[in-house]
Amino acid sequence: MRELAARGYFVLCLAVGRFLRSARYSTARVVDQDGERRVRKRRLFYAPLLIWMGRLLVRILDTGVRVLPQREWEERERLIYRSLHGTSIRLDADNVLVLPVLAGRTLATLLEDPELGESFRKKAIERAVVALAEFHRLGFTHGDAMAENVLIDLAAGPLDAGAAHWFDFETVHDSRRPMAWRRADDVRALIVTSLVRTVPEKRAETLEFMLDVYADEDVTRVLTTSFTSVWRRSLTFHLAQAALSFQCFREIGRLLRARSPRSS
């Protein structure tokens, strides 16, 4: 009976998560501006209402993240682009952020490409994890570190020299949460959004590879707690990021628990 209840709760969270995922706060388009290609990103007119409504929702779901209002979002984008790329971004008079165009394709797009060879898949995942670890070492966390939010440029030199660029910094972690928790939440988001685009027989290997590349057992221990039980309020938000099956969720938890003795 408890197993049936757990599956029912999981399905409910999955359905609500899909609804949450349909919400959009902004739009972005690439334009030619002053002889250069730029990304113009603007908030949708109803975004302030969504953000206001979301404040209560994120507390109820215990997500540990929030979507930033306009001014805080602008400041965060400016700070991160300056830190990562040594470049400034402009704010147009109509509250449009003008960002540089970053090279590459999203990791999500690459992993969904049936023509992409296994070595390139592995290198793309590795580049994303390495870039996330470097981002964390700079003192930042992402807040929505999905495969959809990292660009992989495998053409940036030889295969071993491919580059990855994280983008879309509208979401921020609750600063009251421990740093290990915030980093683990980013790693979780990247792992699950990669695994849902990986064939089942390769998921265990891919999970192990990503954790080995990130190489922080303290973060792995915190990450494991996200998969100990389905009875977590944050599950709805997590399934909004990646629509895992009940079996996949359980399998990830089993693999993480099996890995935990390595830290002893």
Label for each model-derived stretch:
Residues 1-22, 238-241:
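Juxta-kinase regulatory segment immediately upstream of eukaryotic protein kinase catalytic domains
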Residues 63, 67-125:
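Conserved structural core of kinase catalytic domains
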Residues 17-18, 24-73:
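ATP-binding glycine-rich loop module of kinase domains
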Residues 149-166:
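Conserved protein kinase catalytic/activation segment
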Residues 169-263:
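C-lobe/activation-segment region of protein kinase-like
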Residues 137-147:
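Catalytic-loop of the protein kinase fold
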Residues 131-135:
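Conserved hydrophobic alpha-helix
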